[in-house]
């Protein structure tokens, strides 16, 4: 989707529409063996940018404490979990590594019914080769060790609980001589800030917040007060 579509959904909730329980942000990095290569390689928004934008939009609208955010898209390691929780996710969804633990060889036949490992098929002649007992042990081991690694990373950051992670815990090298914290690259919007006259740190919100209403997904459907600001009306 587009930034203005997210804003429209959030604005509709601030105007009395029912609140969502959670929003799942699925980045372009994710994929499926059933998708065409062009879709897997080129469609979607990068997860980091999308996650930060959704977090900032909900926070600026005063809804962040009431709506959870899930992040997904090529989550493989404990660091992926910690990084995206620090950037704004309440939890992450992982699929790829669990499929690998089951024995996926990325044959890209998921939609055909002819998965050679028996994972993505309903054909009894194929799925009977899947040893449930041994694969269950592999999945359990991966899950337990990943959570252990998450705990170690959180401890190394000097905090006791993953909920205390924030953008300051992520450091990114931009060049050979420039290193910035994630909160410098992706400034956080303050609670309810979108309803004040304070400058909006997120450039996408600054551009689209007053151009979008909760009545439409269009990018140029300004609310009356925004139109007044543009025309000098009262």
Question: How would you name each of these model-derived features?
Answer:
Residues 131-234:
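C-terminal extensions of enzymes
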Residues 1-127:
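Glycine-rich phosphate/ribose-binding loops and adjacent secondary-structure elements
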